[in-house]
Amino acid sequence: MFLRHVIVFSFIALLAGCAGLTSREAVQGKGDPAQWREHKQQLSSLDGWQINGKVGIRAPKDSGSGTLFWLQRQDYYDIRLSGPLGRGAARLTGRPGAVALEVANQGRYEAPTPETLLQDQLGWKLPVSHLVWWVRGLPAPDSKSNVTLDGDSRLASLEQDGWQVEYLSYVEQNGYWLPERVKLHGQDLDVTLVIKDWQPRKLGQ
């Protein structure tokens, strides 16, 4: 089940960080829409980060958890999973057009996009380009979304492309308020992300 778990989580890697802010979103909740727009603009400027944390995956026939390392440098990413989730280790690296997945004791898999890996290995169609936005507490800009703001004008929850995303807590790092605990609910798949260390960076335009 290691490969299944790894590929499920590989959808976080598709780069969309440089896209615009023209998301088609319906905003509700306690927060102020003007403050939300400012918050969104600030977070969208982040084009680099390093994350250390934990990830849990629950599907109808299997589940697991493990540690997560995610390095983002504009259009390059290096994502590593290890621990009980995979009974070993895996590394996902790439940039737009070329993705490589290395699984301990199982081999190397390549595809143009993480979506292709999911489709080829599992037959699943998921909005894999969205998590690079969701992990920053933003809706993806290329499809409709329903956004609920908390009292601090940050995302409390998000509905987009059949997924429900809950933001349970935030942490302040280098002047940015970033998600600390996130739950994602999709059809027959739940993902929990706990970020223990955020190192956001603005590398340049």
Swiss-Prot record:
Signal peptide segment: 1-17
Q: Name one Pfam family in it.
A: LolB
Indicate how the chain sits in the lipid bilayer. Lipid-anchor
Chief localisation class = membrane
Assigned keywords, A-Z: Cell outer membrane, Chaperone, Lipoprotein, Membrane, Palmitate, Protein transport, Signal, Transport
Q: Where is the lipid attached (N-palmitoyl cysteine)?
A: 18
List the CDD domains hit by this protein, alphabetically. Answer: LolB
Entry GO terms, CC = cell outer membrane
Could you tell me which residues are lipidated, with the kind given as S-diacylglycerol cysteine?
18
Q: Where does this one sit in the cell?
A: Cell outer membrane
Subunit structure of this entry? Monomer.
Q: What does this protein do?
A: Plays a critical role in the incorporation of lipoproteins in the outer membrane after they are released by the LolA protein.
User: Which family is it part of?
Assistant: Belongs to the LolB family.
Q: What is this protein called?
A: Outer-membrane lipoprotein LolB
